[in-house]
Amino acid sequence: MKPTTIALLQKYKQEKKRFATITAYDYSFAKLFADEGLSVMLVGDSLGMTIQGHDSTLPVTVEDIAYHTRAVRRGAPNCLLLSDLPFMAYATPEQAFANAATMMRAGANMVKIEGGAWLVDTVKMLTERAVPVCAHLGLTPQSVNIFGGYKVQGRGDAGDQLLSDALALEGAGAQLLVLECVPVELAKRVTEALSIPVIGIGAGNVTDGQILVMHDAFGITGGHIPKFAKNFLSTAGDIRAAVRQYISEVASGVYPGEEHSFH
Protein backbone atom coordinates (compact mmCIF):
# COMPACT_ATOMS: atom_id res chain seq x y z
CA MET A 1 0.00 0.00 0.00
CA LYS A 2 1.29 3.43 -0.94
CA PRO A 3 1.57 6.05 1.81
CA THR A 4 -1.62 8.10 2.26
CA THR A 5 -1.01 11.82 1.79
CA ILE A 6 -2.81 15.09 2.40
CA ALA A 7 -2.87 15.51 -1.39
CA LEU A 8 -4.92 12.31 -1.66
CA LEU A 9 -7.49 13.63 0.84
CA GLN A 10 -7.60 16.85 -1.19
CA LYS A 11 -8.38 14.73 -4.27
CA TYR A 12 -11.13 12.93 -2.34
CA LYS A 13 -12.70 16.29 -1.47
CA GLN A 14 -12.68 17.40 -5.11
CA GLU A 15 -14.20 14.07 -6.17
CA LYS A 16 -16.74 14.21 -3.31
CA LYS A 17 -15.48 10.84 -2.11
CA ARG A 18 -16.21 10.56 1.62
CA PHE A 19 -13.47 8.96 3.72
CA ALA A 20 -13.39 7.42 7.19
CA THR A 21 -10.74 8.02 9.84
CA ILE A 22 -10.36 6.74 13.40
CA THR A 23 -8.35 7.23 16.58
CA ALA A 24 -5.63 4.67 17.27
CA TYR A 25 -3.38 4.27 20.27
CA ASP A 26 -1.39 1.05 19.85
CA TYR A 27 0.41 -1.21 17.38
CA SER A 28 -2.16 -4.01 17.19
CA PHE A 29 -5.23 -1.89 16.45
CA ALA A 30 -3.28 0.36 14.08
CA LYS A 31 -2.21 -2.69 12.08
CA LEU A 32 -5.75 -4.08 12.04
CA PHE A 33 -7.19 -0.72 10.91
CA ALA A 34 -4.60 -0.39 8.15
CA ASP A 35 -5.17 -3.98 7.00
CA GLU A 36 -8.92 -3.30 6.65
CA GLY A 37 -8.49 -0.05 4.72
CA LEU A 38 -8.43 2.78 7.26
CA SER A 39 -5.54 4.88 6.00
CA VAL A 40 -5.92 8.00 8.16
CA MET A 41 -5.51 7.74 11.94
CA LEU A 42 -5.33 10.16 14.86
CA VAL A 43 -3.40 9.63 18.05
CA GLY A 44 -5.83 11.74 20.03
CA ASP A 45 -5.55 13.19 23.50
CA SER A 46 -8.82 11.29 23.97
CA LEU A 47 -6.41 8.61 25.24
CA GLY A 48 -6.54 10.48 28.54
CA MET A 49 -10.07 9.17 28.95
CA THR A 50 -10.11 5.94 26.93
CA ILE A 51 -6.66 4.60 27.87
CA GLN A 52 -5.66 6.37 31.09
CA GLY A 53 -9.07 6.63 32.74
CA HIS A 54 -9.14 10.39 33.41
CA ASP A 55 -12.41 12.33 33.21
CA SER A 56 -11.03 14.79 30.63
CA THR A 57 -8.16 15.16 28.16
CA LEU A 58 -6.39 17.80 30.25
CA PRO A 59 -3.86 15.56 32.11
CA VAL A 60 -2.38 14.17 28.86
CA THR A 61 1.26 15.13 28.21
CA VAL A 62 3.33 15.56 25.06
CA GLU A 63 5.30 12.43 25.92
CA ASP A 64 2.06 10.44 26.32
CA ILE A 65 1.05 11.32 22.76
CA ALA A 66 4.56 10.74 21.41
CA TYR A 67 4.69 7.28 23.03
CA HIS A 68 1.42 6.21 21.40
CA THR A 69 2.41 7.85 18.10
CA ARG A 70 5.49 5.64 17.93
CA ALA A 71 3.39 2.53 18.57
CA VAL A 72 0.74 3.42 15.97
CA ARG A 73 3.37 4.27 13.36
CA ARG A 74 4.93 0.83 13.75
CA GLY A 75 1.52 -0.78 13.20
CA ALA A 76 0.51 1.40 10.24
CA PRO A 77 3.68 2.55 8.45
CA ASN A 78 1.81 3.92 5.43
CA CYS A 79 -1.13 5.67 7.10
CA LEU A 80 -1.51 9.44 7.26
CA LEU A 81 -0.91 9.87 10.97
CA LEU A 82 -2.15 12.88 12.93
CA SER A 83 -1.04 13.51 16.50
CA ASP A 84 -2.72 15.85 18.95
CA LEU A 85 -0.77 18.55 20.69
CA PRO A 86 -2.28 18.24 24.18
CA PHE A 87 -3.49 20.91 26.61
CA MET A 88 -0.97 23.72 27.14
CA ALA A 89 1.46 22.26 24.58
CA TYR A 90 0.98 25.17 22.15
CA ALA A 91 0.34 28.23 24.33
CA THR A 92 2.94 30.10 22.23
CA PRO A 93 4.11 29.49 18.65
CA GLU A 94 7.60 28.62 19.91
CA GLN A 95 6.26 26.06 22.35
CA ALA A 96 4.04 24.61 19.63
CA PHE A 97 7.01 24.20 17.30
CA ALA A 98 9.16 22.45 19.91
CA ASN A 99 6.37 20.02 20.80
CA ALA A 100 5.35 19.49 17.17
CA ALA A 101 8.96 18.52 16.42
CA THR A 102 8.68 15.83 19.09
CA MET A 103 5.55 14.44 17.40
CA MET A 104 7.10 14.48 13.93
CA ARG A 105 10.17 12.64 15.21
CA ALA A 106 7.83 10.08 16.81
CA GLY A 107 6.27 9.37 13.41
CA ALA A 108 3.41 11.86 12.95
CA ASN A 109 2.71 13.33 9.52
CA MET A 110 0.91 16.33 10.98
CA VAL A 111 -0.20 17.77 14.30
CA LYS A 112 -3.71 18.73 15.39
CA ILE A 113 -4.38 21.79 17.53
CA GLU A 114 -7.65 23.05 19.02
CA GLY A 115 -8.75 26.67 18.77
CA GLY A 116 -9.80 29.57 16.58
CA ALA A 117 -8.22 32.63 15.00
CA TRP A 118 -5.90 33.17 17.98
CA LEU A 119 -3.87 30.26 16.56
CA VAL A 120 -3.19 31.93 13.20
CA ASP A 121 0.40 32.89 14.06
CA THR A 122 1.07 29.40 15.43
CA VAL A 123 -0.31 27.70 12.32
CA LYS A 124 1.73 30.02 10.12
CA MET A 125 4.93 29.35 12.06
CA LEU A 126 4.47 25.57 11.99
CA THR A 127 3.57 25.51 8.29
CA GLU A 128 6.57 27.65 7.34
CA ARG A 129 8.77 25.16 9.19
CA ALA A 130 7.41 22.12 7.34
CA VAL A 131 5.03 20.93 10.06
CA PRO A 132 1.59 20.28 8.51
CA VAL A 133 -1.32 21.36 10.72
CA CYS A 134 -4.83 20.04 11.23
CA ALA A 135 -7.04 22.66 12.90
CA HIS A 136 -9.90 21.68 15.24
CA LEU A 137 -13.02 23.84 15.73
CA GLY A 138 -16.44 23.48 17.33
CA LEU A 139 -16.41 21.48 20.53
CA THR A 140 -12.75 21.51 21.49
CA PRO A 141 -12.44 19.19 24.51
CA GLN A 142 -9.37 20.95 25.93
CA SER A 143 -11.65 23.97 26.48
CA VAL A 144 -14.23 21.99 28.47
CA ASN A 145 -13.87 24.26 31.50
CA ILE A 146 -14.66 27.35 29.42
CA PHE A 147 -17.59 25.73 27.60
CA GLY A 148 -19.04 24.43 30.86
CA GLY A 149 -19.18 20.85 29.63
CA TYR A 150 -19.42 18.93 26.37
CA LYS A 151 -22.05 20.91 24.44
CA VAL A 152 -22.95 21.55 20.80
CA GLN A 153 -21.11 24.62 19.49
CA GLY A 154 -21.70 27.07 16.65
CA ARG A 155 -25.41 27.76 16.96
CA GLY A 156 -26.71 31.20 15.99
CA ASP A 157 -24.14 34.00 15.65
CA ALA A 158 -21.41 31.69 16.94
CA GLY A 159 -21.64 29.88 13.61
CA ASP A 160 -20.49 32.97 11.72
CA GLN A 161 -17.52 33.31 14.06
CA LEU A 162 -16.61 29.65 13.59
CA LEU A 163 -16.70 30.01 9.81
CA SER A 164 -14.52 33.12 10.06
CA ASP A 165 -12.05 31.21 12.26
CA ALA A 166 -11.98 28.30 9.80
CA LEU A 167 -11.16 30.60 6.89
CA ALA A 168 -8.46 32.36 8.93
CA LEU A 169 -6.82 29.05 9.88
CA GLU A 170 -6.93 27.84 6.28
CA GLY A 171 -5.38 31.14 5.21
CA ALA A 172 -2.60 30.64 7.75
CA GLY A 173 -1.74 27.28 6.21
CA ALA A 174 -3.86 24.63 7.96
CA GLN A 175 -4.26 21.67 5.60
CA LEU A 176 -7.08 19.82 7.37
CA LEU A 177 -9.91 20.80 9.71
CA VAL A 178 -11.70 18.68 12.30
CA LEU A 179 -15.19 20.00 13.07
CA GLU A 180 -16.73 18.61 16.25
CA CYS A 181 -20.31 18.76 17.56
CA VAL A 182 -21.76 21.51 15.39
CA PRO A 183 -25.12 21.77 13.58
CA VAL A 184 -25.24 20.05 10.18
CA GLU A 185 -26.17 23.34 8.53
CA LEU A 186 -22.99 25.01 9.80
CA ALA A 187 -20.85 22.00 8.89
CA LYS A 188 -22.16 22.26 5.32
CA ARG A 189 -21.31 25.97 5.14
CA VAL A 190 -17.79 25.39 6.42
CA THR A 191 -17.11 22.36 4.21
CA GLU A 192 -18.24 24.25 1.11
CA ALA A 193 -16.37 27.45 2.01
CA LEU A 194 -13.01 25.78 2.62
CA SER A 195 -10.76 24.31 -0.06
CA ILE A 196 -9.09 22.00 2.50
CA PRO A 197 -10.72 18.70 3.57
CA VAL A 198 -13.05 18.90 6.58
CA ILE A 199 -13.38 15.88 8.88
CA GLY A 200 -16.49 15.77 11.03
CA ILE A 201 -17.36 14.19 14.36
CA GLY A 202 -20.91 15.00 15.40
CA ALA A 203 -21.20 17.31 12.37
CA GLY A 204 -23.57 15.30 10.17
CA ASN A 205 -22.76 13.55 6.90
CA VAL A 206 -21.99 16.72 4.94
CA THR A 207 -18.26 16.90 5.70
CA ASP A 208 -15.54 15.42 3.48
CA GLY A 209 -14.58 12.78 6.04
CA GLN A 210 -15.60 11.35 9.41
CA ILE A 211 -13.66 10.45 12.52
CA LEU A 212 -14.67 8.38 15.53
CA VAL A 213 -12.93 7.48 18.74
CA MET A 214 -12.31 3.76 18.27
CA HIS A 215 -13.92 2.91 21.61
CA ASP A 216 -17.15 4.60 20.45
CA ALA A 217 -17.06 2.79 17.10
CA PHE A 218 -16.92 -0.59 18.83
CA GLY A 219 -19.25 0.12 21.75
CA ILE A 220 -16.61 -0.28 24.45
CA THR A 221 -16.99 3.18 25.95
CA GLY A 222 -18.14 3.17 29.55
CA GLY A 223 -20.71 5.67 30.78
CA HIS A 224 -22.18 8.36 28.53
CA ILE A 225 -22.37 7.48 24.83
CA PRO A 226 -22.23 10.55 22.54
CA LYS A 227 -25.24 11.09 20.28
CA PHE A 228 -22.99 10.95 17.21
CA ALA A 229 -21.46 7.56 18.11
CA LYS A 230 -22.47 4.30 16.48
CA ASN A 231 -21.50 0.83 17.65
CA PHE A 232 -20.55 -0.93 14.42
CA LEU A 233 -19.50 -4.05 16.31
CA SER A 234 -23.08 -4.74 17.45
CA THR A 235 -24.13 -5.79 13.94
CA ALA A 236 -20.84 -6.66 12.25
CA GLY A 237 -19.89 -9.64 14.38
CA ASP A 238 -16.17 -8.98 14.70
CA ILE A 239 -13.85 -5.97 14.77
CA ARG A 240 -12.52 -6.39 11.24
CA ALA A 241 -16.05 -6.54 9.82
CA ALA A 242 -17.02 -3.55 11.97
CA VAL A 243 -14.16 -1.50 10.49
CA ARG A 244 -15.22 -2.41 6.96
CA GLN A 245 -18.84 -1.49 7.77
CA TYR A 246 -17.75 1.87 9.18
CA ILE A 247 -15.73 2.65 6.03
CA SER A 248 -18.63 1.58 3.81
CA GLU A 249 -21.31 3.56 5.67
CA VAL A 250 -19.20 6.72 5.64
CA ALA A 251 -18.49 6.34 1.91
CA SER A 252 -22.19 5.92 1.11
CA GLY A 253 -23.37 8.67 3.48
CA VAL A 254 -25.44 6.23 5.57
CA TYR A 255 -23.35 7.15 8.62
CA PRO A 256 -23.74 9.51 10.29
CA GLY A 257 -27.51 9.45 9.97
CA GLU A 258 -30.08 11.95 11.19
CA GLU A 259 -30.12 10.27 14.60
CA HIS A 260 -26.40 11.07 14.99
CA SER A 261 -26.68 14.72 13.93
CA PHE A 262 -27.35 18.12 15.52
CA HIS A 263 -29.37 21.09 14.22
From Swiss-Prot:
Gene name, Swiss-Prot/TrEMBL: panB
Reaction catalysis annotation: 3-methyl-2-oxobutanoate + (6R)-5,10-methylene-5,6,7,8-tetrahydrofolate + H2O = 2-dehydropantoate + (6S)-5,6,7,8-tetrahydrofolate
Protein name listed in UniProt: 3-methyl-2-oxobutanoate hydroxymethyltransferase
Binding site for Mg(2+): D45, D84, E114
Cofactor entry: Mg(2+)
Cofactor note as given: Binds 1 Mg(2+) ion per subunit.
Transmembrane segments: none
Protein purpose: Catalyzes the reversible reaction in which hydroxymethyl group from 5,10-methylenetetrahydrofolate is transferred onto alpha-ketoisovalerate to form ketopantoate.
